[in-house]
Amino acid sequence: MSKIGRKSKIALIVVFCIVFCVGIVAGAMAGVATKAIDNQKPDEFLRSWMSYVSDDTLLTDIVIPGSHDSGTTKMMWAAKTQDKSIKEQMACGARYFDIRPQLKDGKLVVFHGPITGEDVEPIIDDIKQFLTANPSETLILDFQHFMSDETAIEKTYALLSDKLDGLMVANKTELSDLDFVKSLTLADTRGKAIVFFGNVFKNTTNCDYINGKNYLFQRNGDSDTRQGSGLQSFYDGSLNRKSSKKYLANAIPKYVDAFENSEGGLFVMQMQLTDPIAIIGPKFYEGTHDENATRFISSLPGKDYFGRVNIIMRDFVGAEKCRQIIALNKDKGTIANDKLSEFASKCA
């Protein structure tokens, strides 16, 4: 055999081995990623679970399932954090939504990093339909980031004013927005959405655009607290990029401490991991995290900070993940006494 022929054969063997190894790794990663998916079917209880909560319960005391980067179901794998539409997530019991609008070709679309996805308007239509059909429920809409320029904020505001007129919680009192949010009971908010806006480009300044609009409330930045914010949600990329166990052991206590040192209000406990290289994608990392996160959530009633647990935000939310979070309301004491037994059976 000639040297050229021998080299060609070796090269083919090397290529085959590389392809084989890549296939093995890809298959293993795909297997891990499937663990992220919640395939449990929703039921009527999940659609109206807030009907079991006492009217006089403060909104800040209810344990609420939420979704991270809620409108990403149609995005490519690197940006996709949900496999269900917001309409489907609402049916599964989620009541907090992280919606990030960007102006693209004159239309508002959802973005996650550099990737864009579905139109915002149909999402708002679904929210209106859900609130109208389910007057016992309350939604928390967190428009925490905007892309493009201030036009994206203006168009989002106009869209909400048009579509959700009469369905948004409004501060018509003499209270500051922060004190107003802290005072809200479920009776005050049933059948409505409470809407929070973040800043346009940076997390360091107050969101001045909400001034004079009594149904827009300010939320904090990822790493700081904007003065007067009614929603606190903390994020440190260096922590969220850790392994699942390190994240739960180190990040959650830090975020709880940050909330305790804040002015208060609604508290979003971020339960998702971040892809450290932005290539593998959220689905794989949620697959490595789901079992640990589920176990951690089950342990929350035994934590000394359980009283502060409010909104728990996850990737790839579905009926099973939401039901587990909703069930914590029994331990929180937020369920009406005459509905407690039925609630417990629905969560079992």
Task: For each feature predicted by the language model, list its residue ranges.
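Active-site groove signature of glycoside hydrolases
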Residues: 135-150
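Surface-exposed substrate-engagement region within the catalytic domains
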Residues: 170-304
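Active-site-proximal loop/turn and secondary-structure-junction residues that shape catalytic pockets
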Residues: 103, 145-147, 201
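Acidic, His- and aromatic-enriched active-site or binding-groove loops in soluble protein domains
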Residues: 119-123, 161-179
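Short, aromatic/basic amphipathic alpha-helical patches
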Residues: 153-163, 206-214, 283, 323-330
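Conserved, mostly hydrophobic/aromatic
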Residues: 89, 100, 141, 195, ...
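Long, acidic (Asp/Glu-rich), low-complexity accessory segments flanking structured domains
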Residues: 27-94, 105-133, 137-138, 201-205, ...
